[in-house]
Amino acid sequence: MNKIIYRKTTKADMKILMKLRLEMLREVNGLSGEYEYDENFIFESRRYFESGEQTTVIASDGETLVGCASLSYTWIMPTFSHPTGNRAHLMNVYTRADYRRRGISKKMVEILIGEAKGNGVTEISLDATEMGIPLYESLGFKASDSCMVMDLEG
């Protein structure tokens, strides 16, 4: 194993990032190895990554992409507890199975937390898997009972 290199993605990384994200979505959602994106999903993902309203970090071992993590920015009306209205949602934190338990996800999230602070973000939310909860707690994230969600698709 080489030294792991971390960097923010560019538009040129879209193809490799989508490939790793597909691997993650198959694993997290229990999809078969044959599952592929549909055209609309690819279009919307490309539009999202090119919008500039997110920061994605990737981790590489030489030429091999081994992990990714994204921070999606949201701007809401300012509140007393969040006077800038700048918030973010952490998502798609993923490290390939043979690279887990080496601190790669933690490092990617730390980079994104620093990026968020630099952009004036006052709150980061996330949806955690059972496997990810200890990682997020170690970084200072806390469970919240104050969030409610309405699914407009269902």
Predicted regions and their residues:
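A short beta-loop-alpha structural element at the N-terminal edge
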Residues: 5-19
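A conserved beta-turn-beta hairpin within the catalytic core of GNAT-like acetyltransferases
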Residues: 75-90, 100, 144
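Conserved acetyl-CoA pyrophosphate-binding loop and the N-cap/start of the following alpha-helix
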Residues: 99, 103-111
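Conserved beta-strand in the GNAT
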Residues: 58, 64-73, 89, 94
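A short helix-loop-beta-strand connector motif used in the catalytic cores of GNAT acetyltransferases and
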Residues: 46-58, 89
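Conserved beta-strand-loop-alpha-helix junction that forms the acyl-donor binding cleft
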Residues: 124-134, 149-153
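Conserved GNAT-fold acetyl-CoA-binding loop/helix
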Residues: 25-45
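Conserved GNAT acetyl-CoA-binding A-motif
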Residues: 109, 116-128
